[in-house]
């Protein structure tokens, strides 16, 4: 951001210094104990276990029909509004595209302050989006589309420090919400369609100094380097663009990684291409790899495994076990031992044709002929996958895992050889889907035989589908469950709805006039529970009729 823009922002913000919106410091212990204060939403996925399950219960199956719109915030951008807001003691912190932070009264929508940042040389693949913030003490943290990490005073919006994470001209971008662990701010870099070399970095929350870095594409001398042919590791991708999770008992942080580069011309990168399309478990203090599991070795399909790692403590074969639940873009649902990374279960939750199952080590068994070709190859699931970055939820009350899914959707995968050029597209082909993306100008000509969107409820013990809520269109909305056994979600068709989490019964819905492309959140102010969600370029907030 230029000095002139900095001056304009500073003058604007100093005029708002008198806004009395702050009462206490948010310590890391507060974040770890987020379930003890469900009136707030302190991290991207509600807790470091990323279950997106709230203990609030004022809104129930009996009264959810009485939800009424309380206020709307309209963003000053027409880009996709994908961020999950934070809520701290009655103040809601939102990010509007591309990188503007807004502090609002969570009960009324009144704006306290706005911090505007204009990313320079940003080259995102898929929209100028941001998915949220992190908070520690009285400081907010935001990653930007030009790969900056910025610390912002939560009281008045004044920038505190700014550090460069990666080179924006090479198409490194940050789109996800940072994750706070102890006194560190963790972020990863996106840019897998441009041949970046992915990594996750930890930064000192006070200064912005890098503390450690883990390369998701290992270089010479690093374990896993042998899974890359020639010099392909230098442009290997494996981006990180969705927020990870953390288990304090194990001191492990878990992150999903994206596709290897180029996406569809895998001839350019022989080998399994570690650690692309994997979950990696890192020591939170040092960044050292403890274990990994690769969902799609030598990915041909752009099946990013950046889904949120959902942590749960369940009974497994009669014994208590720390597990990780994962619905992958590749169409399979997984259960892993999160202490060791051991593969416990893999089962398709949508139609899958690229793999027939798993070997004894948990590695997928590829189906012959199911690879991109010059003429195009039809594969299920399609390029959008069975699911993607939109957040699932796990309810300890029902014991079910809930997925926003693209059911029975396919693509024609085409590979096109081509050279790498810094900062330019390096996809190596294309994927033709029968369902237009929601940012496409093409009309939506979806037919039922081409797939549909749904909320799926899975039994983690078996991977079996317990119920399905079918939508008229596909979905890019996350899921929220609550202690009153409600499930909130939405879809591209423009509805926001509440289901009975036990059986999928529709209890309430409202038309918002635009696609829901974020995860709902819930919070309370002065004893009143609210539910908020983004649709189009607006933030809608609901509460029970008074």
Residue ranges and their predicted role:
Residues 198-209, 272-287, 340-341, 453-460:
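Beta-propeller blade signature
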Residues 73-84, 114-134, 162-177, 194, ...:
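Extracytoplasmic beta-rich repeat domains
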